[in-house]
């Protein structure tokens, strides 16, 4: 299942930017997971979000402060997480906006525990209450 067609031409890149509100000053590059380390050393101001985090996880630009705070809290890079992580955090952020709540990464950590899997790096698992 490839998604390179979303970013393969200037027209498809323009429609991707429009559909997901990606600003012009955000550089988009489609690369394989194995090539991320090569691109990481080219710039200190580069952050890698998996394409699926945008497509399925709800990541939008500018990146939500709750996502940034949660990544800092767990000490993780965006490319270490599956789309489900972003979906959970994006839903909590949406609840904050709709109902005027002030939920943060501590509330997420209260409900979910961060687990590690060899294949998918890290993921959130609901805690047994």
Q: What do these predicted regions represent?
A:
Residues 1-129:
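Residue-register detector that marks a fixed positional context within folded domains
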């Amino acid at each position: 299942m490839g998604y390179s067609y979303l970013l393969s031409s200037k027209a498809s890149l323009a429609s991707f930017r429009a559909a997901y509100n990606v600003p012009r000053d955000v550089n988009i590059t489609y690369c394989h997971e194995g090539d991320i380390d090569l691109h990481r050393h080219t710039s200190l101001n580069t952050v890698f979000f998996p394409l699926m985090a945008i497509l399925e996880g709800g990541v939008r630009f500018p990146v939500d402060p709750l996502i940034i705070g949660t990544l800092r809290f767990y000490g993780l890079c965006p490319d270490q997480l599956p789309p489900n992580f972003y979906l959970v955090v994006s839903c909590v952020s949406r609840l904050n906006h709709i109902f005027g709540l002030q939920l943060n990464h501590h509330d997420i950590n209260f409900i979910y525990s961060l687990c590690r899997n060899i294949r998918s790096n890290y993921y959130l698992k609901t805690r047994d209450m």
